[in-house]
From Swiss-Prot:
Keyword Glycosyltransferase: no
Catalytic EC class: hydrolase
The species this protein was found in: Macaca fascicularis
Binding site for Ca(2+) 1: 656, 659, 661, 666
Region spans: Linker: 587-649
Lineage, opening ranks: Eukaryota, Metazoa, Chordata, Craniata, Vertebrata
Activity-regulation annotation: Activated by micromolar concentrations of calcium and inhibited by calpastatin.
E.C. number(s) listed in UniProt: 3.4.22.54
Family the entry assigns: Belongs to the peptidase C2 family.
Entries under Pfam families matching the protein: Calpain_III, Calpain_u2, CAPN13-like_C_EFh, EF-hand_8, Peptidase_C2
Protein name: Calpain-3
Amino acid sequence: MPTVISASVAPRTAAEPRSPGPVPHPAQSKATEAGGGNASGIYSAIISRNFPIIGVKEKTFEQLHKKCLEKKVLYVDPEFPPDETSLFYSQKFPIQFIWKRPPEICENPRFIIDGANRTDICQGDLGDCWFLAAIACLTLNQRLLFRVIPHDQSFIENYAGIFHFQFWRYGEWVDVVIDDCLPTYNNQLVFTKSNHRNEFWSALLEKAYAKLHGSYEALKGGNTTEAMEDFTGGVTEFFEIRDAPSDMHKIMKKAIERGSLMGCSIDDGTNMTYGTSPSGLNMGELIARMVRNMDNSLFRDSDLDPRASVERPTRTIVPVQYETRMACGLVRGHAYSVTGLDEVLFKGEKVKLVRLRNPWGQVEWNGSWSDGWKDWSFVDKDEKARLQHQVTEDGEFWMSYEDFIYHFTKLEICNLTADALQSDKLQTWTVSVNEGRWVRGCSAGGCRNFPDTFWTNPQYRLKLLEEDDDPDDSEVICSFLVALMQKNRRKDRKLGANLFTIGFAIYEVPKEMHGNRQHLQKDFFLYNASRARSKTYINMREVSQRFRLPPSEYVIVPSTYEPHQEGEFILRVFSEKRNLSEEVENTISVDRPVPIIFVSDRANSNKELGVDQESEEGKGKTSPDKQEQSPQPQPGSSDQESEEQQQFRNIFKQIAGDDMEICADELKKVLNTVVNKHKDLKTHGFTLESCRSMIALMDTDGSGKLNLQEFHHLWNKIKAWQKIFKHYDTDQSGTINSYEMRNAVNDAGFHLNNQLYDIITMRYADKHMNIDFDSFICCFVRLEGMFRAFHAFDKDGDGIIKLNVLEWLQLTMYA
């Protein structure tokens, strides 16, 4: 049996007690500045039926811009209005921000002044240093910058108060349109701003990103990798610097050369997430205090003396007494951009240097190689010019590589391709993208510490077809990278959502199962160990890792650490050579052909169709007398009536009356009378709605009633399904776990895909993810009825049917 998942425990995002128990805790990612709650989303596989009534198609930026110019009005964004709803969702703030357009804030506003660069970014009073650190990295790659920030925008030519920015969003690029109203206090920007008072590209980019996630507050706290990926569509690798490879400097250098984005941070040993208020202090009052203390003089373009005071300037994120700045000037729990690597000749020796930037635009490293370090005088003047050394408080500074790896704990690298940074070769990689979801009670099975449910997680077959082209490597190996990303958790924070702890495992598929797209069952995972897996389960938006495995067929199982956690994800697989990656989906089918009893016009026709038969006109019900005289024996029955059959006949006669047919109310009485005599089956009986569905299943002439023969057919089915139910009701509670419903449905001869299993769970499980006997039978009745109806219409057997509106409504309304 595979071993239990073990994972190292990284610093937690908040001060909270560990849960007791033998299962090892997953690693926790240190979100740079905030926390959140936890909630399950609402999933419906048939939500698309509501799409036509949601609204008209969104207009493009060009259409909106043109319309505003024609009407000579300034654009106001109805989806992200300039009011409190776009700012914060958790509480009402005690001060009121004034929304102003740039021409109302200053004279001669400009979108970009002398090119967008990293010194244009100064953090405001929102805990989104992770986002701003990524912007600083983005400015180092002009090609990427122009993709995210279209430069044909202006406050002068064709100005209409409308701007747009582009972000990579879960596999596709989206255009986010905003108005240019920005929150201010005392006529100063509250959030991100530029060193130039009249430059606004960074503030507007932040607003567009806030709209993408639902509010400004949603940007509070995160990891730099999130924004890096949203700017590039790249794939991120995450390094714990203390456990990093010996050639880390080489890796960082190659990242710079290839245009990769890099960020770093220092774990906060206080267990307080940076950017959150201390216990007992209201966050609204805290930010209000900060905003009121903003020093307007900081917005002048004149240089500031960085050594004038040991106190941090008043334009801060948190009050000085709550900051986590160290004596060396670095800040714990804070995101920095890595903006350069170099080497300098110092006293006859080469010294490796790293250039970093604090998104605050101030508060810098004060050790060796800092701006004001006295030994810069020993460096050649031309070298200093090449390194752009300046004594300015702009948040950017140099430090030695040795000091960097000593003080910093995390390094995040967003690669624009999946090429390994240890390699000197650039490859053309193939990528496959699969979207999926974990649905509570059906496909949210948790990690392999939970063997009863792990197998229910979504599964993705990966076929590695060709080995790598590496003449120096004698192994027959395929290199690939797997990246699992959870979707929309930040946007759903206002609903209580937080990042799940996620990871994945990779299993090799036995040769005899190659090409078989069936979902691997529980026993497979009980007796087969994984060939590879993510290094750890961690609460980051994306988990990625490189692997080298022989050509073969594998299955990737993405999961949350705990079961029953519902969410969406995308799974990306990058490989040097051709690969095939697709979700495992069972073929929808039913085991044995059953008589198809269904007509397209119930009111006027009386047809009974078989799977391999032509329809027979005029074949209807026999009279009650004939049915009673010569009942058709059921499979497995003897000629002589059993005690149960005699009991049925007597009860049926008592309830049915002279016409020997029963309606839904009468069927309920018959079934519940018989079921109650089965003491080994705990059930509250059948509901009227279930009985109506049963009649719809067995009714051959649209009368809305069942005769004795039809009732016998129905009861035999219920008995067969009852055996399946009792098999999975292991604790004899009268319910089965929704995760077992997949196997129960399969045992009954119905083979469905993952989407249909999800629908069954949503439709028939209770809030505890249990399914009682009545719901169980009702589900099977509906399944059999739908399969019968489909086969009745699928006259040519090609698996496709065409219905007119009358047939469709008849099919769905009487079922």
